[in-house]
Regions:
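Double-stranded beta-helix
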Residues: 1-5, 78-114
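A short glycine-rich, His/Asp/Glu-containing loop-to-beta-strand
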Residues: 1-37, 41
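A generic "binding-loop/recognition-motif" signal
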Residues: 29-31, 40-41, 59, 75-76, ...
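Short beta-strand segments
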Residues: 33, 59-61, 103
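Glycine- and acidic-residue-biased ligand/ion/polar-headgroup-sensing regions
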Residues: 40-53, 57-58
């Protein structure tokens, strides 16, 4: 299965079709993804295990196992794992016209990525 390790954890690509892309994302304890948005895709997140702390357009939301959230195109968002010991695992379904990693516009990033 194709995937990539990142400073905050790892993702695996479960499906990569022309009209959608599906990833299984694991966020290590006390890590978070960048605060970002996308020009060409929306995202649906479903929590598999752990507690997700989501920021969506500056609003804080907590999601537990089996909870989900929709991230519209252009919406600023981030997800964080506040657990000190357990991984956060969620499924991300991307819908849109382009799914390249270069459609990530980072507003803030703990790892100084652009």
């Amino acid at each position: 299965m194709e995937g990539e390790t990142r400073p905050w954890g790892r993702y695996e690509i479960l499906s990569d079709a022309q009209d959608c892309k599906v990833k299984r994302i694991t966020v290590k304890p006390e890590q978070r993804l960048s605060y970002q948005y996308h020009h060409k895709r929306s995202e649906h997140w479903v929590v598999v295990s752990g507690i997700a702390h989501v920021v969506l357009d500056d609003v804080d939301i907590e999601l537990g196992e089996d909870d989900s959230i929709y991230i519209p195109v252009g919406a600023k968002h981030r997800i964080k794992n506040n657990s000190k010991t357990e991984d956060l695992v969620f499924i991300e379904v991307q819908c849109g016209t382009y799914f390249g990693e270069d459609d990530i516009v980072r507003i803030t990033d703990d790892y100084s990525r652009e």
